[in-house]
């Protein structure tokens, strides 16, 4: 379906391009909505990331073939997502993030088809493989009726071409149908050179990703108009920005301001001194600096906690707002964690850490079913083949973790912005406190493994002697000892999450 049904056409885009030339490429000024208000709303959310083509089909099939190595469209759709919102909400998620929605190159390339949504051809058309404009609007409406939010993945760093960069037919792109809108062809060769990162091209000689000159006011002006209309037409609450570190930084701010909603930028870099400054240009950043130490600690029982505890502190001092970082342990670009370890206790600990740490938790579809695909394309499985089992041990764990996070936010308006502190640690466990006095959660994460056990005492909890606290995972209760300390036993390597009984009152958690 064309966006033209909403009053936004290729002709309008062409007019904008022509007008911007007439005014000497001066930036277009918009009546901006309140991005900060949107960002504040997102701090309290828990996001379920969906690869639209692989989550749920319109026909409801749980047997339809989807061979990931074929890299073909498998039939996932907006209607499929709508029909499975109970499944998502049953895990306590308050938002979803879906794949890019615009028209893709149609070719069967050396890397298959563009089922993932990152090979853009035309921003004036929707990708009809996922459904119609009305179905996308219905998805937003159904989410909002449940007080849930919609985040859509957006690409504005590049287009895509099936072939070498020297052979690109720019006239096939809409609306940027001339080479002058793009950087000259050169593949990125040095990721330590920011000019090379921003001005050269991602991709390779098989599938080229022509790099837009987003620093050009003509180009970013079109995207400002486009995203403003796009967000309003489809009632979108937030945007995930693909390849953000490859975009001119000033353009990131212009785009977010024009969108009027929270933007979560993909900055694929584990160094916080590189990643954190991107919050000067957009509100949110994917938390790769946290991803790597989390991955290393929870995937290896011989790893020690020092790197992870250090990174918690470093992010708090380096990033302007850790509550707006997007935390994850799996996504469409990374291997699934169960492909690295089959130890269920380690998998549960990393899930708990992601959901209960500083920032916005993002769980990748299929984590709740223990999907174990490795590198792309193996990590983009069809979820329907799992049967959407709500009795899965990971589905039940994620439900509990989201439930306690949502309850903590309900009881304590400062919970999301309260910075976690590591109150106790050793080589193989970390205990954190998050939340204001009388409402704080004490979470204990470990990498002992399913055969591991350890008796520990956690001090500096902020509890008072005699306070009753409950581990929401096991539902076992403990009385705080002298000075509020907790003496507990880690058994079977399981994480523990303690909350005061007063916080749980009326929640239904552990029958409270």
From Swiss-Prot:
Q: Where in the cell is it found?
A: Secreted
Cofactor(s) for this UniProt protein: Ca(2+)
Cysteine pairs forming cystine bridges in this chain are 66-74, 186-200, 276-319, 475-510
Instruction: Relate the outcome reported for changing residue 483 to F.
Output: In strain: CCRC 21164
Binding sites annotated in the UniProt record for Ca(2+) 1: 157, 198, 211, 246
- UniProt-listed Gene3D superfamilies: Glycosidases, Golgi alpha-mannosidase II
| Cellular component GO terms, alphabetical | extracellular region
User: Glycosylation: which residues?
Assistant: 233
Q: Is Calcium there in the keyword field?
A: yes
Site (Transition state stabilizer): which residue positions? 333
Quote the record's activity regulation.
Answer: Alpha-amylase expression underlies catabolite repression by glucose.
User: Where would you find the membrane-spanning parts of this chain?
Assistant: none
Cofactor: binding comment: Binds 2 calcium ions per subunit. Calcium is inhibitory at high concentrations.
Could you tell me the Gene Ontology terms of the biological process aspect for this record? carbohydrate catabolic process
Q: Enumerate the InterPro entries for this protein.
A: A-amylase-like (IPR013777), A_amylase_C_dom (IPR015340), Glyco_hydro_13_cat_dom (IPR006047), Glyco_hydro_b (IPR013780), Glycoside_hydrolase_SF (IPR017853)
| Residues the record lists as binding substrate | 119, 158, 240, 245-246, 270, 333, 380
State whether keyword Disulfide bond applies.
Answer: yes
What EC number(s) are associated with this protein in UniProt? 3.2.1.1
The signal peptide annotation in the UniProt record is 1-25
User: What's the effect of swapping residue 280 to S?
Assistant: In strain: CCRC 21164
Its family remark reads: Belongs to the glycosyl hydrolase 13 family.
Q: What name does UniProt use for this protein?
A: Alpha-amylase 1
